[in-house]
Amino acid sequence: MTLNSLPVWPALQAHYEEIRDAHLRDWFAPANDRAPTRAERFTFEGGGLAADFSKNRLTDATLALLVRLAREAGVEARRDAMFAGETVNPTEGRAALHTALRANAPDAPFQAQVAAERAKMARFADAVRSGAWTGYTGKRIRHVVNIGIGGSDLGPKMVVHALHHVATPDIATHFVSNVDGADLARVLERIDPEETLAIIVSKTFTTLETMTNARSLRDWFVANGCPEGALAKHFVGVSANPAEVVKFGIAEANVFEMWDWVGGRYSLWSAVGLSIMIAIGPERFDELLAGARDMDEHFRTAPLERNLPVLQGLVGIWYRNFFGAQSYLVAPYSEALHYLPSYLQQLEMESNGKSARIDGAFVDYPTSAVTWGEPGTNGQHAFFQMLHQGPTLVPIDFIAVLTPEHPLASHHPKLLANCFAQSEALMLGRTLDEARKIAGPAKPELAPHLTFPGNRPTTTLLVDALTPRTLGALIALYEHKVLVQAAVWNINPFDQWGVELGKILGKVVEADLTAAQVDPAKHDSSTSALIARARKALGE
């Protein structure tokens, strides 16, 4: 299947030509925006969240055509196959059953294994949180260091930061991912080996960055007085390769299992989320799962016309494949969601940044947009200038939490006002005539600089309060959005072959950086010159 061969495609192209120059300002004008208002028609709810799509460049006809696109592309069939545990990752011959990790239904796949592993996690988390699990000198654990990269880092770090307000104050959680030694060194400055628990997270337990950091941390423990025989009090491992964990030196009883039917970027619901469970406790971890389950149920059962992940995915395709948007921005007006944009970068671009279709042919249309973002209001003082007055179209997801999770309640109206005002300003803009009035007769030359084109599309997601449950629903919303877009683009969102070539060449380059001699013909002239400079700096 090619995207532009679907029966609905010519109708969508014609519709795009018809409305591409229409301005959102006119659609919201009182003469056109009669009951039910545009906001009422384009606001939908599901999984405890609300989404206002009304400030997007679409009409009722647009949505009808996009929903038809979803049906013709087989979105429903792909969704149902994923939930059923079918092989939806054909290049690796695997299912993608992250939804089974939160299913809580006896007929869902792998429920016995999932329940047993979660119970083991809960026992361990309770022991650490209560002080029953101690370090080698008998002191309780005060620091947890999660060592992992990609999905073994981004998801847990994002959730622990987001739910800080419900986390235990007795344990600080640190995350180390980068192979740059500075990342680990800065954490080592803040922790005490007698009070530190290390969680090493790697699906294969061979990941270069993770194992380099794990070995350095193990050496640090021993160098700072921990007997090698007591390391079991300070190291646990999470992996789909338990034998390799034991080979590293972690006690078999301290191994938590993940499975190859869960992709790394979808794995925070598994034992990969052990650092989350220690921080917020097993009961709140269950609430996180329940929120994701709420969105799973909404995704499975809501009509496509009112289905939040479906609509979010289709709106993204509308801008990517018709308006030619190269990127889209995620702007959470919540400091608690500081790491959500970086988490979504991996979720969206590692999943859908593909050029090969499932059938092996190459696409002739754009796939994943560049995903980026920063919390509000910080972003307003960095890149919103470009969003308002630059020539580039950047669709935006605003995320607003309506009630604060902190005691400084007087700040919150200011935060929400900025979020809502930005969406309004991006939609309305300011005409040249309006700008001339502001510039006045004394400075008419200023008017062009005071104009705003407006017509910049935004979606606003509303969360009543940031709780484990609503956070779980928000994360699952984006997970399912990715699947919807992958189905329409006919690509596999569950593999990541694009990360492999650099890894392979990285091992060759690393060997050349320390080798006695290097054959300059082994690499291109640029890479050879870079290696030569680095060897000189390293004293080789």
From Swiss-Prot:
GO terms for molecular function: carbohydrate derivative binding; glucose-6-phosphate isomerase activity; monosaccharide binding. GO terms for cellular component: cytosol. Keywords: Cytoplasm, Gluconeogenesis, Glycolysis, Isomerase. The active site is at 350 (proton donor), 381, 503. It catalyses: alpha-D-glucose 6-phosphate = beta-D-fructose 6-phosphate. Belongs to the GPI family. This is Glucose-6-phosphate isomerase. It comes from Burkholderia mallei (strain ATCC 23344). The lineage of its organism: Bacteria, Pseudomonadati, Pseudomonadota, Betaproteobacteria, Burkholderiales.
